[in-house]
Amino acid sequence: DSIKHHGPAYHTGIGRVVYGGGGITPDIFVAEDTLGMTSYYKEASMSGLILQYAFSYTDDNRLKLNNFKEMMEMSDYLNKQNLVEQFATYADKHGLQRRNLLIKKSHKLLERSLNGRIIYNMLNEQAWTEYINQDDPVIRHTLEVFHNNAAFPKKPAAVAKKPLTKKKKK
């Protein structure tokens, strides 16, 4: 949930602290939410089963899906179709053993992936991108930073220095 610095500290021309040791440390850190990430979800994604099911669902339901021209409208419809349950049955028949506890834990990610791919198939890449990013914490935080005009790092406040006084010779 945080970034640890192991390299030496350096100061930029405007006084910002940066660290050596390789890599780039972001000015703003947003922790990744891995709560719904399970072995079931990873296998479903990596095996291509989500893409295959979404393509099959799109083909089987194209006439109905053609009625939706807007991403949110299609998303609302898809949310009512119990796609995660349908996918779990499909995946089980195609070699991914049904794991109800893991499916429940990954429900939001599975639903987001399935709906997103169907939206991509029926609308376009822009609609898919908007759908996938609508509640992404990094996107939300980025918009908040821009809204607050804090997008670029500010020069650190100068440390007050004591005025130099010359020592009197004795």
Please name every model-derived segment.
Residues D1-K170:
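Conserved functional hotspot residues or short segments at active or partner-binding sites
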